[in-house]
Structure formats: C-alpha cells, structure tokens
Design a protein with these regions (language model features):
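Positively charged n-region of N-terminal signal peptides that target proteins for export
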Residues: 1-5
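Bacterial N-terminal signal peptides
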Residues: 7-15
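Primarily auto-inhibitory N-terminal propeptides
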Residues: 18-116
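Functionally engaged cysteine thiol sites
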Residues: 25-59, 181, 253, 273, ...
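Extracellular (secreted or membrane-anchored) zinc-dependent metallopeptidases
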Residues: 27-28, 79-81, 87-97, 102-143, ...
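Secreted/processed peptides and extracellular or luminal domains of membrane proteins
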Residues: 44, 260, 279, 344, ...
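Short active-site-adjacent helix-start/loop capping segments
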Residues: 146-148
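Primarily marks secretory-pathway-exposed extracellular/lumenal segments that are disulfide-
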Residues: 310, 323, 327-382
Length: 382
C-alpha cells in the first residue's frame, strides 16, 4: 500500500518483541539476538533536521513519483536495461576474526546479484508481485585514480566497535574514507557493536558517508556469518534502503506505509518467518527483503519496489551516474599510458590507453617568441 512516509534505515537486532523497541548502544552486549528491529526514527529525525537533506529528499521523491507515473513503455525507453554498480568493500578490522576472507566477501556479492536479479534459489512459491530488479553488482576493478584494484580495502583499526556514528567511514576516526559516491557503492564491514546488523544511508545524504555498513558477522553465507542472519540478506535489505526503499510496514501502523503500491499494508515489522500473518485486513508480505524476517524467510522485491529503485538511475535520478560508472571496466595492466598524440603526456610506447591523457599543457604558444613551446596547448603568459 502507498502512503507517504520518510524514514532513514538504521537496522539493528534486539532480543525482544514483535514491535519497535529501544535500540541498544554500542557498549552493550555483542551477542546475536533472536529478532531484529530498527531504531530508524531517531536517525531520521536527526538527518531531517538538516535543511539540505530534507530538501534533497523532497526532490528525490518528486522525481521518483514522476518516473512512476510514466507508462511502462516510456520508462523502458529511457532506462538502462540492467544497471551494474561497482562495489568497493572497506574491511575495517580490530582483530583477525573481523578481517573476513575474500571468499566471504565474494559470497555476499553473489547473494546481492542473485537477490536483486531474482536468481536466488528460494525464489519459487512466493508472491506474484515478485520481480527481477535489473540491478547487478560488480567488484570494483579500477580505483578513483584509474589504477587497478581488487575492490577490497583492508584497514587495521584500534577501534573496538564503531556504533552508528559513521566513524567507520573516515580514516581520521579509525575507519576508511569513502570512494566517490557517484561511481561506487561503498560497503563498510566492521564490528558495529550493540547487536547492530547494519545500516544504510538513503539517497540525498552526504557523499562522504554514502553507502552501507554491515557488521562482520552478517556478511555473506560463510566464515563469520551467524544464524539466523547468515544468508547475506542483511546486505540485501540495507542496499534496498540505499536504493530508496523503505521498510515494507512504513515504520508505523496501518496508516503509514512504504510508498510502493503493490506491497500490502502492515501494522508492524515481522520477525522469524511468520508466513500467513495478517494485519491491516490483508496478509503480510513477510518474505519481502524490506521486512525484518530471518534471512531464510526473505526471497523477493516487488515490481513496484523495482520501479522505485530504477527511478534513481533514470535521467535526473540521484544515482544516475552509477549507471555509466567505469569502476568495473577492464583494468589496464600492460602497456598502459596516454595514446593520444595531441595530449601533453602522450606516451609513444603505450599500447593501451589508461585514461590519463592531459590536454591542458601550459607554456608559450606564440611561435615567434624565444621560449615558444610546441607542446603547449594553453598559453601561460610567459
């Protein structure tokens, strides 16, 4: 059901009740609780207190509604068929256990691709609204400077737990600085603390903090992955928020929902796997990635959620630049350099252009001057 609401995603687990509760602090127990809930309202109020974020959220929502109102054929003509998003993992660890393996990271990447493309093995026997979101993820092969990378940064830290203050996103506070948000999905892995699974920043916030944070115990489906959140669906849920999806119950009662027309209204989050649970005169979609069911219970995004996510990549969308990012382009490894003979830094020995060509050489461009520089393209007044 579609009833406007604006909520930021800050997802955590606690060990009580099928209702919203008080979030534990980072200093509290790190034990894995049996259920999850969300302290999103406090974070939402905090961010919406800033005029810039509030205004940007309004603009994004207006653009989303314009996109949703277009005929399907018109949307199809404007959108990329499948959007591939480069991902950089920032693994910030205080000990060897937190420094999760490449294999565990790759398992998470595969789960994201399976879930967003509806290739997950548990996709059968679910709601008819289920859809392929046509969003894929690739491990970054080029860093912001165009250098080859494996897309995984490993940063040793003295910080025992980061909480939700975004300190993990800054090297100055023991974390790792974000790569440009217009070209990459930043995915931080760390010990969040306080029983928190992870959190995401909705579109419209600062580029310096844009991305997803997941506790090292809830990434992928191997290694440190811990039941009942050991199938990588925490990341699927959080990336959903990063792509502008709200919780399916709208963080409220039957009078609030998620701005998606084909998700049934619900009066609260669902935990465990409450298949068949009813509220608001309909059956709750507990299998939706944006509810709070256990990982094994989740298996779909809807067609309406797909449209909402795809609006971000449409002309004028907040994340449109990601659709053309070269963060996953084949890296130049042999014979790299500038191959354009008109560039200042032309390399006659280069066999593969690495994107470094510079056409702004300064010098004297007057051929009659004593210090004429034939390579100069911009006169420096000398």
């Amino acid at each position: 059901m579609r009833i406007p609401t604006l909520l930021f995603a800050l997802c955590l687990v606690v060990s009580f009740g099928n209702a919203q509760g008080v979030a534990p602090t980072a200093s509290q127990s790190n034990a894995v609780p049996a259920q999850r809930t969300c302290a999103s309202h406090d974070k939402y109020v905090e961010m919406m207190g800033g005029a810039k974020f509030s205004e940007m959220r309004s603009r994004i929502e207006q653009q989303t509604q314009r996109w949703e109102s277009q005929p399907v054929e018109q949307r199809s003509n404007q959108a990329n068929t499948v959007v591939t998003i480069p991902v950089v993992f920032h693994v910030v660890y205080a000990n060897g256990t937190q420094n999760i393996s490449d294999a565990q990271i790759m398992s998470q990447l595969q789960i994201l691709n399976d879930d967003f493309r509806r290739l997950n093995s548990d996709a059968d026997n679910t709601w008819s609204q289920a859809a392929d979101s046509e969003v894929e993820f690739c491990l970054a092969t080029n860093d912001p400077q165009g250098n080859p990378t494996d897309g995984i940064l490993r940063i040793s830290t003295s910080v025992s737990s980061f909480g939700t203050s975004d300190n993990v996103k800054f090297s100055s506070s023991g974390g790792s600085d974000a790569w440009p948000a217009g070209s990459y999905l930043n995915f931080w892995v760390c010990n969040v603390g306080g029983g928190i699974l992870g959190y995401a920043q909705f579109p419209g916030g600062s580029a310096a903090t844009d991305g997803v944070v997941c506790d090292y115990r809830y990434v992928g489906d191997m290694g440190t992955a811990t039941a009942p959140f050991d199938l990588g669906r925490t990341a699927t849920h959080e990336v959903g928020h990063w792509l502008n999806l709200y919780h399916i119950w709208g963080d409220g009662n039957c009078n609030q929902d998620d701005q998606v027309s084909d998700t049934p209204n619900s009066d609260a989050a669902n935990f465990g796997c409450a298949t068949g649970h009813q509220s608001c005169s309909s059956t709750d979609m507990v299998q939706n990635y944006m509810d709070y069911s256990d990982d094994a219970c989740m298996n779909l995004f809807t067609s309406g959620q797909k449209t909402r996510m795809q609006a971000l990549f449409a002309p004028g969308g907040f994340r449109a630049s990601l659709a053309t990012s070269d963060g996953c382009a084949p890296a130049c490894t042999i014979g790299c350099g500038c191959t354009d003979a008109t560039a200042c830094n032309y390399d006659s020995a280069a066999t593969e252009d690495d994107g470094s060509c510079d056409f702004s050489c300064q010098g004297c461009t007057d051929a009659e001057a004593c210090n004429y520089d034939a390579d100069a393209t911009e006169d420096d007044g000398s």
